[in-house]
Structures are given as structure tokens and as C-alpha cells.
Amino acid sequence: MRWKYWDEWPDWPASRGYVMAQDDDIVAHGAVVPLTCLWEDRRIKVVRVIDWGARAKPVGSGVLLMKRIGQMADAVMAVGGTEMTLKIFPALGAKKFGMAHSYARPLRPLRRLLGERKADWRAGARFARGLLWSVQAPSSLPPGWAARRITADQLASTHFPRPTPRPGMAVFERSTASLDYYLRCPSVLIELYAVEKSQVPRGYFLLAILRRQVRIIESWVDSNDAGDWRALHLLAVHQARRHPDAVEVATMSSDPVTRQSLVECGFHDRGSAELHLLDCSKQGLPGADLRVQMLEGDAAYLHDGSVSLIA
């Protein structure tokens, strides 16, 4: 909880958890993930609200808290959410920015089958599907590409390309301080890898290790070439496979370039969630696709201990 709500975050010195109280009772709660959206030459201060909830009475307490949080940023972002979120956000004037899709690729179908709590026909069907997907997925790494793990104490002195806006696509900034914050996550192991081609830095990815599932919570390569994006994601799968307990690798993305690359690397679409942005400063939202991954929220590290598999 301390790391999530109070640990130091760049450009957000205060607590990131907020409550609304009435007569000493908490009636609404929400926490924020501070983000900086890069679009053309603009820097848009965005917050993603997580852990948002409110009591039925007094009516409107959750909406009021959301509006108060919105006063601290240019925009508020929602990715999916509860039925209440999906109703309230559009009612507040939020604009839909597409869909965030979840993807998964099986790593060890037999190990997953042996770990099933209930060995029924559904488990057998999942094994057969996972085996088929594994056989169909590409496995060889492209020549000249390599991934090198970067530890927290190496981060400040290691150069690698970070996300930059492209024509028709807005991205979220990745500062050294924000990456360092995630490497200090106490609930899951998060690994950072710099990606190189012929020893030239080209990009990076972040993995969250949750025993049976490895998540690609962020990935980027400084290229518009589909082959370079495939190399990036195949390297991520290769590193995920180095964890012997992992039976699948999962990720999330909204932009078409990343999504197409994931499909070509053997990932399968496992569901989607609506993206919404609420313009709080009235200075205008990005007129482009919004690139969203797991790192924009608590999907990067959230789990209940058992880890629900999705492949």
C-alpha cells in the first residue's frame, strides 16, 4: 500500500490516494496513476483512476470525487472498469479512444495442465488449445537482436530509446524516475530489458513475473518496421520462457502496430476494454490513437496470489 499510494513519484509529490468523507465516514475512495501524454509538441497531464469506489449513499459521492481528482490534471483516463465506471464516465463527457486488447501466448501447456486444480474436460480442452497455439507460434529469434537486463542501479547510466509520439499516435512518457519506481515494486518482480540490434540500442521491454504468468507490461522499439516490432516481442517471449514456472505470457495493448506484432508472434486476443479520456482542462484531447499498455494502471502488478491465467 505504501509503494502504491505514497512512495515518491516524479512530478506528483503528494499522496496518490484520495477519500471523500461525511461525518467521519469514508463514502468514496480513489487512487491515481500519474501520467504524461505526449502528442505532437504537447505534454498533457493525465491521471488514471484506480481503486475507485463509492457507497450508494450519499448519491453522487463517487462522481464528486472523480471531479475533484480531475481538477489536478488535464485529463482523466479510464480503461474498462466496473458497470458504474462505464456509465458515469461517458455521462461526465468522456470521449472514447478505442479499445485496449488483452493478449496471451502459452509457454508450457503440459505444465499448466499438471497444475490444474480440477482435471475435467475443460482443462483438457485448454491443454489441446494451448498445445496447438504453442506449435503454431514462432520460436526462433531474428539474427542480430539481443536483450540485456538493466538493474535499478544501472538505469540512470543506460541509454535506450523511449516512447515518442508518431503521426496519428499519442504515447505516454517513460522517464528514468518512473521506470525506477516500477523496478521497486514490492509485490512482484519486475525486470527491465534494453533491446539492441547489432549492439545498437533500439528499444526496451518490462516483464512482471507472477510465477505461472509473465506479463509484458511495457514494450517499445524506435521503428515503424513490422519486423523490428516482431523482434522486440519475440525477445520478450524468450526472456519470459527463462522463468521455469511460467506457463503463459500475457500483455495488453491498444495501438494497431503493437497488436499486429503480437498476433504475428503467436499471441491471441483474449478480450478487450473500452478506453475513455475525460477532458478536465478544456485544452483539447489528442487527435490521435492513444497507445495504452499495462503500465498505465495496476494491471502491471495486480494479482490475488493465484494469478488467473487467460491463454
Question: Which ranges hold each PLM region?
Answer:
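Amide-forming acyltransferase catalytic core, primarily the GNAT-like/NAT-type
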Residues: M1-E40, I44, K95-E218
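Beta-hairpin (beta-strand-turn-beta-strand) motif
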Residues: L35, W52, G81-T82
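Residues forming well-ordered secondary-structure scaffolds
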Residues: I44, G60-L64, G80-K87
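Conserved acetyl-CoA-binding loop-helix of GNAT-fold acetyltransferases
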Residues: D51-M72, A78, A226-Q239
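Alpha-helix termination/capping residues and helix-transition junctions
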Residues: G70, S187, R242-H243
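Active-site/acyl-donor-binding loops of N-acyltransferases
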Residues: V76-A137, E191, Y204-G227, L234-A311
